[in-house]
């Protein structure tokens, strides 16, 4: 089939012989093929987007896997060739990894945007059995998580935005939805449109001073840099 023929051609060219033995495939070969595969995918998608929709930014495919994607210099190097902004769904950490964020910029040369992150409150009355976000005890804790997480994004200097996932809680009465997206407190409003005011107040507190916070963090960073060069 076409896929096998393409892989075989790539592998033979990499090994420099025809019908290179499959039993000699190494981890380095697997890594190289992953990079080749991703580059091919990104190139084809980008060519079509640039042709038919040249005036919009391409945000990519929302990286999510820690070791396979978010800690991979090769993946980010490819992403930097094609994406305008690199999109990332950020889970499984209480705050973004500062070293990773610095590496993303170094590896790709592009800014990033966080396209998903959230926590679920145990005081919501929902079971919170589904979803990638972790559980916290209260809506206030959700708000403090938000403030800390976003502050670290701003501290990085290379984040251009963030999206809380999601606007509304899963409706526990709607059994037609996917079971993995049915019973959790992900939203800033409940499934009946009642706002989580404690959470929203904490979010607003940070959002209202975002630019002042950026200036403060940049000044602190510049001050630290001056000290290291003295």
Q: Where in this protein do the model-derived segments appear?
A:
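Glycoside hydrolase catalytic-domain groove-lining segments
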Residues: 23, 32-47, 51-131, 151
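Conserved residues at the C-terminal ends of beta-strands
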Residues: 89, 162-165
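Histidine/acidic-residue-rich catalytic or RNA/ligand-binding cores of hydrolases
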Residues: 123-133, 174-183
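Aromatic-rich peripheral "rim/lid" segments of glycoside hydrolase catalytic domains that contact
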Residues: 165-230
């Amino acid at each position: 089939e076409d896929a096998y023929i393409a892989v075989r051609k790539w592998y033979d060219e990499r090994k420099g012989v025809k019908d290179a033995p499959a039993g000699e495939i190494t981890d380095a070969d697997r890594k190289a093929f992953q990079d080749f595969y991703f580059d091919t995918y990104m190139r084809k998608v980008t060519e079509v987007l640039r042709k038919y929709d040249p005036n919009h930014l391409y945000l990519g495919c929302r990286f999510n896997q820690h070791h396979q994607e978010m800690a991979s210099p090769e993946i980010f190097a490819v992403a930097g060739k094609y994406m305008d902004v690199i999109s990332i769904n950020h889970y499984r950490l209480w705050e973004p990894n500062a070293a990773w964020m610095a590496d993303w910029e170094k590896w790709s040369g592009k800014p990033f945007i966080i396209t998903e992150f959230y926590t679920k409150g145990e005081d919501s009355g929902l079971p919170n059995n589904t979803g990638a976000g972790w559980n916290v005890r209260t809506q206030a804790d959700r708000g403090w998580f938000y403030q800390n997480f976003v502050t670290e994004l701003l501290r990085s200097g290379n984040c251009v935005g963030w999206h809380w996932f999601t606007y509304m809680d899963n409706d526990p009465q709607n059994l037609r939805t996917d079971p993995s997206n049915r019973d959790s407190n992900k939203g800033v409003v409940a499934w009946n449109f009642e706002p989580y005011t404690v959470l929203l107040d904490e979010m607003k507190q940070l959002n209202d001073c975002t630019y002042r916070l950026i200036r403060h963090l940049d000044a602190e960073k510049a001050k630290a840099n001056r000290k290291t060069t003295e």
